[in-house]
Amino acid sequence: ADLRAKNPLVHCITNYVAMNISANVVLASGASPAMIHTPEEAADFAKIVGGLTVNIGTISPAWFEGMKLAAIAANEAAVPWVLDPVAHFATPYRSRAAQELLALKPTILRGNASEIMGLGGQASEAKGVDAKDSVESAEIGAMKLAKAHNMVVAVTGKTDFVTDGIRTARIFGGSPVMPLVTAMGCSLTCLMGAF
């Protein structure tokens, strides 16, 4: 109810596959989504929102520039932001982009177990966008990442694991159907930006 009363504007830089469903998830929560990614306006927009989300799912050079500008502007304006490093391990370009964005100090890092393990330097079984590793196997890496970057890390899956590097929480209620529907994780990232 409080979220609906506040109706925060959420700047969602997400991928083409996820835009529609993510916008609808944010709307259903009571927040207001804005799917803005162009470098020409990303920074200006990031300064006036309640939260920013950055998802590298369909990254391109122009989108990457917009992501960096938005993250820098969000930090300058004390706007919290969430990084979703979708399949950062798939290509060298994607990996470099995820590392550059991580260096810009997101408030929250949200990913599946394979993504978090990869960013934390752990070996992973992943090959595409879907997790091949268990949430439990990513917990130590998540705690190390959270401490090293002074952020919250959320490893999502059947049971989510959330940590700031010291405190931990498990969130139950995941569905086995979620991996069968595209953009569920991406939508969760945008929803997190509303809070």
Describe the residue ranges of each PLM region.
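Conserved phosphate/ATP/ADP-binding segment of small-molecule kinases
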Residues: 92-168
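Glycine-centered short loops/turns at secondary-structure junctions
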Residues: 30, 76-78, 150
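Glycine-rich, highly charged phosphate/nucleotide-binding loops
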Residues: 33-41, 62-67
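Short pre-catalytic strand/loop immediately N-terminal to key active-site residues, enriched for Gly-Thr
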Residues: 143, 169-182
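An anion/phosphate-binding loop that grips the pyrophosphate of nucleotide cofactors and donors
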Residues: 49
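Short, small-residue alpha-helix embedded
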Residues: 118, 182-195
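Glycine/small-residue-rich loop that forms an oxyanion/phosphate-binding "nest" at active or ligand-binding sites
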Residues: 55, 63-112
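Glycine-rich phosphate/adenosyl-contacting loop at the front of the ribokinase-like
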Residues: 1-35
